[in-house]
Amino acid sequence: LPFALQDKIGVAKNHAIGRNRYIGYLISLATRSYDGMRVGLDCSNGSTFNIAKNVFDALGAKTFVVGNEPDGTNINMGCGSTHIENLQKLVKEKNLDCGFAFDGDADRCIAVDENGMEVHGDYILYVCGKYLKECGKLQNNTVVATVMSNMGLFKAMKRENIDICVTTVGDKRSEEHTSELQSLFAIS
C-alpha cells in the first residue's frame, strides 16, 4: 500500500475503554455460564478479533481462535463467515463443542456444530424463538425472517404458535421490522 501523504495522515485513537465497556455489555446479556464448553471462533481478521474471545472466555468457555490477526488489508480474506472451512477444520481437529464465524464488521455470524457442520440460520431462529416463548420473553410472540427462509421454518413456527413477520432480504429491512415489532432478534 502506498503511504499516506503527510497532510493526509489521520489520528490513531485507543478505543480500549469503549471496547471494554462493550465487552462488559455483551457479557451482561448472557443468561448462563459457558463453563466446560470448548468453542471455536473465526474473527475474519475484523472487528471481533479482540472482542469475541474475551466475551467467551469471561463466560467460562475455553476458546480457540482463527482469523484474529488483522493487518488492515486482510479482513474477510479466506476466513470468516464467507469461508467457514477454517472454522470447520478447527472445530473437528480440536474436538470442540461448536464454533462461530463472523464477518468483518460482525453483522453476520455463521454457526457450526460439534462435527463442523453449518447450523443454518432458520434452525437457529426456530430454537431461539421457541426458547424465548417458553421463557415468556418472546416479544409480540413474533420472530422476523426473510423471504429466503425455508418453508420448514414457517411450518415449525406455526406448530409452536409463533408468528413470523416476513421481510425482504437485508439487514436494514430486518432491523426495521425488528424495531417496529419490538422483537429481540431477526434473521436477514
Map each language-model feature to its residues.
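Short acidic, glycine/serine/threonine-rich loops at helix termini
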Residues: 50-54, 76-79, 109-115, 123, ...
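Gly/Ser/Thr-rich loops at beta-strand to alpha-helix junctions
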Residues: 44-50, 106-107, 149-151
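Single conserved hydrophobic/aromatic residue that forms the stacking wall/gate
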Residues: 176-188
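Proline/glycine-rich low-complexity loops and linkers
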Residues: 2-23, 28, 115-175, 179
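Gly/Ser/Thr-enriched, mixed-charge loops and adjacent short helices
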Residues: 1-92
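Glycine-rich phosphate-binding loop signature in dinucleotide/nucleotide-binding domains
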Residues: 91-96, 137-138
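Self-splicing inteins and homing endonuclease
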Residues: 98-99, 104-115, 179
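Buried hydrophobic positions in well-ordered alpha/beta secondary-structure cores of metabolic enzymes
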Residues: 26, 42, 84-88, 100, ...
